[in-house]
């Protein structure tokens, strides 16, 4: 039987012995093809078991996309609309409160809200949304906004990003979404999201949030026009931040949904990641991010079957129930609104594991 080349086998043996992967080693692993993919996945799976055992987790949450109106025009996004577009929408107080009441009736522990950059939003707009949710669902964990929204609110309000997050927290924000990271390489960002904050600004705002005691997720959006070296650089930036702050709750690989995006239609991006790339993203993340406990397999982005395979490749979490999801659907994903915990349990048990409900910050709940 053909085996993995000795130099790559040595990398896996070293990391299983406690060696910290370098960017160069990560690039070599991410570029692996043929049977070597399975060996990398197996090594990642072993590290996952050492770190978190055989529990698969999920969070009972509801997503609320408040508006698709956005001042930016990111090439990877099929969600954003401009004022006057026939399918543009904005949910005001009555609608947001109504959706929050639905969340309460569904017994969620988390409400997640990230939206377009509405032309008229400032920090008070975000604070009002959080306060409406908090009023309707007392005690719920509000996981919301991201560094881009923080920077936008700061610019619109004439205050610092730190002040924005202090005001957001006062209004009910619990943790910050680690989205808007995409690829933390500015040459790539200039192609896929030229109007978004740069890498340094994203990292600075995340560090500020963690310094304020506001924890966040960490993400990568891959499978468009980036290289393996870009992915490795991105992972290294996240690892460096986590070394400093210990503020990331999880890492979430987000596979690029290409179908309805300007970037793909203009020929500037490939048709998303392959299955090999998906598995290696989860596996190499587990091997590289030695200071992260949890890696989420987003069923919205990769589908339930690939999410289950990700659980064999280093991932330990299936994300949320969501109930409502618009951003991935508008980009061309299917069946993105809801995944029943019963189906998550079937996936976990198929692998001989136990499904447990968690909080946003990974405390296990009874039952």
Curated annotation (Swiss-Prot):
SUPFAM superfamilies assigned to the protein according to its UniProt record, in alphabetical order: Radical SAM enzymes
Cofactor binding note from Swiss-Prot or TrEMBL: Binds 1 [4Fe-4S] cluster. The cluster is coordinated with 3 cysteines and an exchangeable S-adenosyl-L-methionine.
Residue ranges of domain Radical SAM core in the record: 56-290
Domain of life: Archaea
Keyword rRNA-binding in annotation: no
Coiled coil: none
UniProt: [4Fe-4S] cluster binding residues: 70, 74, 77
GO molecular function: 4 iron, 4 sulfur cluster binding; 5-amino-6-(D-ribitylamino)uracil--L-tyrosine 4-hydroxyphenyl transferase activity; 7,8-didemethyl-8-hydroxy-5-deazariboflavin synthase activity; iron ion binding
Cofactor(s) the record lists: [4Fe-4S] cluster
Membership in a protein family: Belongs to the radical SAM superfamily. CofH family.
Assembly description: Consists of two subunits, CofG and CofH.
Protein name, per record: 5-amino-6-(D-ribitylamino)uracil--L-tyrosine 4-hydroxyphenyl transferase
Encoding gene (name): cofH
């Amino acid at each position: 039987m053909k085996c993995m080349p000795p130099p790559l086998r040595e990398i896996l043996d070293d990391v299983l012995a406690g060696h910290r992967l370098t960017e160069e080693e990560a690039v070599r692993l991410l570029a692996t093809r043929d049977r070597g993919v399975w060996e990398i996945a197996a090594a990642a799976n072993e590290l996952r078991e050492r770190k978190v055992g055989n529990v698969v987790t999920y969070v009972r949450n509801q997503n609320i996309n408040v508006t698709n109106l956005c001042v930016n025009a990111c090439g990877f996004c099929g969600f954003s609309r401009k004022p006057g577009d026939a399918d543009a929408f904005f949910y005001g107080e009555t609608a947001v409160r109504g959706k929050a009441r639905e969340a309460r009736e569904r017994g969620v522990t988390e409400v997640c809200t990230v939206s377009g950059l509405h032309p008229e939003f400032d920090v008070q707009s975000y604070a009002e949304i959080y306060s409406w949710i908090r009023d309707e669902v007392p005690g719920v964990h509000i996981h919301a906004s991201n560094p881009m929204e923080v920077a936008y609110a700061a610019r619109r309000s004439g205050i610092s990003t730190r002040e924005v997050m202090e005001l957001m927290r006062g209004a009910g924000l619990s943790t910050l979404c680690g989205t808007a990271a995409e690829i933390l390489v500015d040459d790539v960002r200039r192609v896929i999201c030229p109007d978004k904050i740069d890498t340094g600004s994203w990292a600075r705002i995340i560090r500020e949030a963690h310094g304020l005691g506001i924890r966040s997720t960490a993400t990568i959006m891959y499978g468009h026009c980036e290289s393996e070296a870009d992915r490795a650089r991105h992972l290294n930036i996240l690892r460096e931040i986590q070394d400093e702050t210990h503020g990331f709750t999880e890492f979430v690989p987000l596979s690029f949904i290409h179908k309805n995006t300007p970037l793909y239609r203009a020929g500037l991006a490939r048709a998303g990641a392959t299955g090999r790339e998906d598995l290696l993203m989860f596996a190499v993340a587990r091997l590289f991010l030695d200071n992260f406990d949890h890696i989420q397999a987003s069923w919205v982005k990769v589908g339930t079957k690939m999410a289950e395979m990700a659980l064999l490749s280093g991932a330990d979490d299936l994300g949320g129930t969501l109930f409502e999801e618009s951003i991935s659907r508008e980009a061309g994903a299917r069946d993105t609104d809801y995944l029943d915990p019963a189906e998550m349990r079937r996936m976990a048990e198929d692998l001989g594991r136990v499904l447990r409900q968690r909080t946003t910050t990974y405390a296990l709940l009874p039952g």
